[in-house]
Swiss-Prot record:
GO terms for molecular function: proteasome binding. Interacts directly with the 26S proteasome. Interacts with NUB1; this interaction facilitates the linking of UBD-conjugated target protein to the proteasome complex and accelerates its own degradation and that of its conjugates. Interacts (via ubiquitin-like 1 domain) with the spindle checkpoint protein MAD2L1 during mitosis. Present in aggresomes of proteasome inhibited cells. Interacts with HDAC6 under proteasome impairment conditions. Forms a thioester with UBA6 in cells stimulated with tumor necrosis factor-alpha (TNFa) and interferon-gamma (IFNg). Interacts with SQSTM1 and TP53/p53. Ubiquitin-like protein modifier which can be covalently attached to target proteins and subsequently leads to their degradation by the 26S proteasome, in a NUB1-dependent manner. Conjugation to the target protein is activated by UBA6 via adenylation of its C-terminal glycine. Promotes the expression of the proteasome subunit beta type-9 (PSMB9/LMP2). Regulates TNF-alpha-induced and LPS-mediated activation of the central mediator of innate immunity NF-kappa-B by promoting TNF-alpha-mediated proteasomal degradation of ubiquitinated-I-kappa-B-alpha. The gene is UBD. Its main location: nucleus. Induction: Rapidly degraded by the proteasome. Cell-cycle regulation with highest expression during the S-phase (at protein level). Induced during dendritic cell maturation. Negatively regulated by p53/TP53. High levels in various gastrointestinal and gynecological cancer cells. Induced in RTECs in common renal diseases including diabetic nephropathy (DN), IgA nephropathy (IgAN), and hypertensive nephrosclerosis (HN), as well as in hepatocellular carcinoma (HCC) and during HIVAN. Inducible by the pro-inflammatory cytokines IFNG/IFN-gamma and TNF in cancers of liver and colon. Keywords: Acetylation, Cytoplasm, Nucleus, Repeat, Ubl conjugation pathway. This is Ubiquitin D.
Length: 165
């Protein structure tokens, strides 16, 4: 932050976490504050709602656009929005020349093991040899699909371990 820039002290309150305090510039976006909150709470930015009084702050707007531009302390309230758990259509893309596609109906609450079992049903490839990625991340056993930020229409990519060399 430039030495002459006015500095804000932002306090974020929540029922679930201790008071969080951040220094900010009036021209910082609300999203930047949400990223600070994520670093302390692990709550994804898209699942956060920040309130100034009863007004919901929009991620792309700057703090100054809400009249927050002087050297002062502001108090924000954090609410966590739980994503719904409806079935989401995802497409599984097999590796190889054919790149076959399969439709999978997956819930955010589905475990990676459950998804790998669905993949076995569609492809015949056993879970032990499956390498599945979504949004650039390898799906790990013991995790839930919600951990990967899945959305309707995401692609899952399937590759396999080569057994025996």
């Amino acid at each position: 932050m430039a030495p002459n820039a006015s500095c804000l002290c932002v306090h974020v309150r929540s029922e679930e976490w201790d008071l969080m305090t951040f220094d900010a510039n009036p021209y910082d976006s609300v999203k930047k504050i949400k990223e600070h909150v994520r670093s302390k709470t692990k709550v994804p930015v898209q699942d956060q709602v920040l309130l100034l009084g009863s007004k919901i702050l929009k991620p792309r707007r700057s703090l100054s656009s809400y009249g927050i531009d002087k050297e002062k302390t502001i108090h924000l309230t954090l609410k966590v929005v739980k994503p719904s758990d409806e079935e989401l259509p995802l497409f599984l893309v097999e590796s190889g020349d054919e790149a076959k596609r399969h439709l999978l109906q997956v819930r955010r609450s589905s475990s990676v093991a459950q998804v790998k079992a669905m993949i076995e049903t569609k492809t015949g490839i056993i879970p032990e040899t499956q390498i599945v990625t979504c949004n650039g991340k390898r799906l790990e056993d013991g995790k839930m699909m919600a951990d990967y930020g899945i959305r309707k229409g995401n692609l899952l990519f399937l590759a396999c371990y080569c057994i025996g060399g």
